[in-house]
């Protein structure tokens, strides 16, 4: 039996007077005392006698943490970039929006720039070409913005164009949309008949929702959004809910969870703390305190579980073993209304300072092709967690993978905190998942 420092990486986490011993590459969680924690540490450093003592102490359980062959785990390792030939794309059809959310991470609706039709078809054609060249029978298109509802005729026309190309090439397109739910009944019916899935933004009871998510004239949006959610449920449409939590609403997360579970059939609800970017940075809305978010998330999670639902948060995902937080680290293809290619949904404005990091090309209307800055794209592939010194001893390392790169870079540019608030949230909620894995929740 051999213990390899990388493949047998172990994290020791204090818990109620004992220690959680976590072996991410072995999908193993043990609970032990300080002596056992020290013994595992010695074994992991190559102490042969410690290995034998572990065998005597743990018996068969020792096999769970032993690694006999290198590469025996399923870590999603980011490779060097190959040619840019995406078979999935996110189309930001417009910067316009049918809401003026006070905490918007962008400035939705401030600009009405909309993607020209020849760009819509050109990008779609390139994705089909890439799928055909790769011998794929499927590809994926996500519609985003702004909000597609602000340019509804273009949204419908783009979906119709996809369907025409599907029929002629025999390549199936999976479609999804991020929507604020501000739709009329005809739009709701069309969406559920023509789009495969959606993420719907709802912040909870009307009074909470309408405190931040308002129409351009300042009036409430909850009436329209609730009707959209009701229609989704009536036709058994596949969708998830995303709720943004602010300092003003964090103490009501339990209530929000109960409302959403009582009024929606969505199986998965995601709650995220507001982040001060875009319009949010200049508004009265404030991000919640990290510990307060954690405490109230735990209450809301119990409510959701009682309804048979899953409450999630992006930085706590024990079921994901990876060295990158998301596809923004090189794999993503998001085309903005102006034709820029960004890897990050949250960085879609060329004037954003982070555009220098996440923008890596443009759609060329003359050649109807992608012009890519390979040096910038290669730098995106240099964002994995292994390149982040502050993460190396953290037990969340292979799950949050250094956290959302846009938020991390924004925080690093705005603050010198050693422990950003999201790190605290990530650690506490991931610790909860480890405790649950021990059966001691």
Predicted regions and their residues:
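N-terminal [4Fe-4S]-dependent radical SAM core
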Residues: 3-31, 50-90, 134
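Flexible mid-to-C-terminal extensions adjoining Fe-S/redox cofactors in radical SAM and related proteins
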Residues: 3-7, 348-441
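Canonical Radical SAM [4Fe-4S] cluster-binding loop centered on the CxxxCxxC motif
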Residues: 83-84, 88-119
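Radical SAM enzyme [4Fe-4S]-AdoMet core and its adjacent flexible, acidic
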Residues: 1, 211-223, 230-329, 334, ...
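Conserved, mostly hydrophobic/aromatic
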Residues: 97, 101, 143, 200, ...
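Radical SAM/AdoMet-radical enzyme domain recognition
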Residues: 121-144, 151-274
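Short cysteine clusters
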Residues: 97, 101-104, 326-329, 344, ...
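A broadly conserved sequence feature marking short terminus-proximal activation segments
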Residues: 51-70, 336-372
């Amino acid at each position: 039996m051999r213990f390899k420092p990388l493949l047998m990486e172990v994290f020791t986490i204090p818990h109620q007077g004992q220690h959680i011993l976590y072996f991410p590459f072995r999908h193993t969680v043990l609970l032990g005392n300080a002596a056992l924690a020290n013994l595992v540490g010695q074994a992991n450093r190559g102490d042969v006698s410690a290995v034998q003592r572990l065998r005597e102490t743990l018996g068969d359980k020792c096999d769970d943490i032993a690694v006999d062959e290198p590469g025996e785990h399923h870590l999603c390792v980011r490779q060097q970039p190959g040619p840019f030939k995406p078979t999935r794309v996110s189309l930001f059809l417009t910067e316009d929006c049918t809401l003026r959310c006070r905490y918007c991470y962008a400035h939705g609706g401030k600009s009405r720039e909309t993607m020209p039709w020849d760009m819509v078809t050109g990008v779609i054609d390139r994705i089909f070409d890439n799928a055909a060249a790769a011998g794929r029978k499927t590809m994926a298109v996500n519609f985003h913005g702004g909000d597609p509802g602000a340019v509804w005729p273009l949204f419908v026309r783009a979906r119709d164009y996809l369907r025409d190309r599907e029929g002629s090439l025999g390549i199936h397109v999976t479609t999804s949309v991020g929507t604020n739910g501000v739709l009329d009944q005809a739009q709701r019916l069309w969406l559920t008949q023509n789009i495969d899935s959606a993420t719907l933004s709802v912040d909870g009871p009307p009074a909470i929702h309408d405190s931040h998510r308002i129409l351009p004239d300042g009036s409430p949006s909850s009436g329209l959004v609730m009707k959209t959610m009701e229609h989704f449920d009536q036709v058994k449409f596949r969708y998830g809910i995303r709720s943004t939590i602010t300092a003003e609403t964090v103490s009501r997360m339990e209530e929000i969870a109960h409302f959403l579970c009582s009024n929606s059939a969505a199986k998965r609800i995601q709650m995220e703390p507001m982040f001060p970017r875009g319009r949010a940075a200049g508004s009265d809305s404030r991000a919640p305190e990290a510990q307060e978010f954690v405490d109230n998330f735990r209450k809301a999670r119990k409510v959701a579980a009682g309804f048979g639902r899953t409450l999630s948060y992006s930085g706590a995902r024990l079921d994901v073993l990876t060295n990158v937080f998301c596809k923004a680290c090189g794999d993503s293809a998001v085309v903005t209304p102006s034709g820029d290619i960004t890897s990050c949904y949250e960085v879609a404005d060329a004037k954003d300072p982070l555009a220098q990091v996440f923008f890596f090309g443009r759609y060329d209307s003359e050649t109807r092709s992608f012009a890519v800055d390979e040096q910038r794209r290669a730098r995106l592939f240099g964002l994995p967690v292994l390149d982040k010194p502050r993460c190396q001893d953290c037990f969340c390392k292979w799950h949050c993978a250094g956290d959302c790169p846009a938020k991390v870079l924004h925080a690093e540019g705005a603050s010198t905190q050693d422990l950003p608030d999201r790190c605290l949230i990530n650690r506490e909620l991931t610790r909860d998942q480890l405790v649950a894995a021990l059966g001691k929740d």
